[in-house]
Curated annotation (Swiss-Prot):
This is Na(+)-translocating NADH-quinone reductase subunit F. It comes from Yersinia pestis. Composed of six subunits; NqrA, NqrB, NqrC, NqrD, NqrE and NqrF. Belongs to the NqrF family. Keywords: 2Fe-2S, Cell inner membrane, Cell membrane, FAD, Flavoprotein, Ion transport, Iron, Iron-sulfur, Membrane, Metal-binding, NAD, Sodium, Sodium transport, Translocase, Transmembrane, Transmembrane helix, Transport, Ubiquinone. It is found in: Cell inner membrane.
Length: 407
């Protein structure tokens, strides 16, 4: 009898707690529809069920806010201004948003759980962002760990981007086996040496990542990307490989890919100042876009130089393109520094790290480096070294433009 009584009492307690939780939820959580008012514009506003993240709500209503990390809260790009209804800012947002910005209502859309009516402000350019289903034209190795992905935009459509901008690529759940990658013989040495073909990438949920475009606006009908495969570092060999880079490397001509855009803020200033471009690795992409745009579309007469760092001759690409630009434009010069030239390279050019080469062979004798505009994109260590070097030369922040894809 005591056992039965105990079971009955326990059941009643569980039922009572369940009722209390459901009652509290009904009072505290809005499970009905809410209204998101945007820029005080009725045509841009919408009604939706409560409970989803603001980033997802906006996307489902055709408003695509940049989020390079796919909504994970790590990139800090999906900034919106909330005027009313957003609740308190979360600790996960404070590493990307200053106290002053927080007071002004700045939030990360991927971290805002919409429970009540919202009033928000978005930049007008966001409403020009669209989605396209593109077709893979080609996906070829340009270096040992870098592929050039060329996508065809649907006929009649235009992606209205500016040089230095980026798009986002979407990937559905998938499994990629590195053993299936088509890596040309000339690049297979390091792949075999580090046993990279053993890896697999298993992705169980939709993923979004951002990539800078390598083409410039007058290369119509295509999107051109330089994508470095993100293999696990040697110190952590069992870490999972990069989700999106693995997916992109698996793409073949004819495959369909969903992109959204354009996005960006890594744009050239409209001045007459000298432009110095500094790149490394897959950071080539926005460098190519900018330099082609300046010389081919704008026919700029500004003094322009490009300093690119690579490991060996095998890792250099677009060499003929930049040689031709240099031959056709007296105001443009480009330079490569190899950090580890191989005997077969027969290299007679600059050697070492690109920031040292730039300093020793140009900037240390420059009459006014602080008056130049510096545009850079490369691995985080390169970016940090270049920025320190520029600061030591007295270059102000306003003249240092960084596409921080690896930060």
């Amino acid at each position: 009898m005591e056992i039965i009584l105990g079971v009955v009492m326990f059941t009643l307690i569980v039922l009572a707690l369940t009722v209390m939780i459901l009652f509290a939820k009904s009072k505290l959580v809005n499970t009905g529809d809410i209204t998101v008012e945007i820029n005080e514009d009725e045509d841009k506003s919408f009604t939706a069920p409560a409970g989803d993240k603001l980033l997802n709500m906006l996307s489902s209503h055709g408003i695509f806010v940049s989020s390079a990390c796919g909504g994970g809260g790590s990139c800090g790009q999906c900034r919106v201004t909330i005027k009313e209804g957003g609740g308190d800012i979360l600790p996960t947002e404070l590493s990307h948003i200053s106290k002053r910005e927080a007071k002004e209502g700045c939030r990360l859309a991927c971290q805002v759980n919409v429970k009540q009516n919202l009033k928000i402000e978005l930049p007008e350019e966001i409403f020009g962002v669209k989605k396209w289903t593109c077709e893979v034209i080609s996906n070829d190795n340009k270096a040992t760990f870098i592929k050039e992905l060329k996508l065809k935009i649907p006929d009649g459509d235009v992606v209205p981007f500016r040089a230095g901008g980026f798009i986002q690529i979407e990937a559905e759940p998938h499994t990629v086996k590195y053993a299936d990658f088509d890596v040309p013989t000339e690049y297979r040495g390091d792949w075999d040496k580090f046993n990279l073909f053993r890896f697999e990438s298993v992705v169980t949920e939709p993923t979004v990542r951002a990539y800078s475009m390598a083409n410039y606006p007058e290369e119509h009908g295509i999107i051109l990307l330089n994508v470095r495969i993100a293999t696990p570092p040697p110190s952590v060999p069992d870490a999972p490989p990069g989700i999106m880079s693995s997916y992109i490397w698996s793409l073949k001509p004819g495959d369909k890919v969903v992109i959204s855009g354009p996005f960006g803020e890594f744009f050239a200033k409209d001045t007459d100042a000298e432009m110095v471009f500094i790149g490394g690795g897959a950071g080539m992409a926005p460098m190519r876009s900018h330099i082609f745009d300046q010389l081919k579309r704008l026919h700029s007469k500004r003094k322009i130089s490009f300093w690119y760092g690579a490991r060996s001759r095998r890792e250099m690409f677009y060499e003929e393109d930049f040689d031709q630009l240099q031959a056709e434009n007296d105001n443009f010069r480009w330079h490569v520094a190899l950090s580890d030239p191989q005997p077969e390279d027969n290299w007679t050019g600059y050697t070492g790290f690109i920031h040292n080469v730039l300093l020793e062979n140009y900037l240390k004798d420059h009459p006014a480096p602080e008056d130049c505009e510096f545009y850079m994109c490369g691995p985080p260590m390169m970016n940090a070294a270049v920025i320190k070097m520029l600061k030591d030369l007295g270059v102000e922040d306003e003249n240092i433009m960084l596409d921080d894809f690896g930060g």
